[in-house]
Amino acid sequence: MSSKPLNYLTIGKTGQHELIIKKSKFICSLARTETVEEAQEFIEQISKKYHDATHNTYAYTLGLNDNQVKASDNGEPSGTAGIPELKALQLMKLKNVTAVVTRYFGSIKLGAGGLISAYSNSVTEAAQNIGVVKCVMQQLIKFSIPYTRIDEI
């Protein structure tokens, strides 16, 4: 028997959600991605869009068994941005999702705990606002039989 899940949770569509925490603006952009190339393309797209931001951090989880995961703090103190974003995706059991959180610094330092909370909450709230959907794995099976044998089915 296969160990692959028969269904999984992901986001319903690409979208964004914004939080303001102690004058810092956090914009979380989420996209459904199935390959590293798709994830990197989305990260680059958001980073270009918000090129003037203080940070564009990211995390992604790809594959139904989290086969490929990656996180980046993009200049924030180590472990305060990308990993909390990744953990938020994993706690919500989301698969094939890339999160990019853009931060515009608001002149008040948040400290390590504040950053961890802000980045994690950005992803969680974005997913809740954008919408989580359940994907059910299906396989289409086609077969043909002679009309004279239709009663045998």
Residue ranges of model-derived segments:
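Hydrophobic side chains in well-ordered alpha-helices
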Residues: 39-42, 119, 153
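Short glycine-/aliphatic-rich beta-strand segments at the starts of folded cytosolic domains
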Residues: 133-147
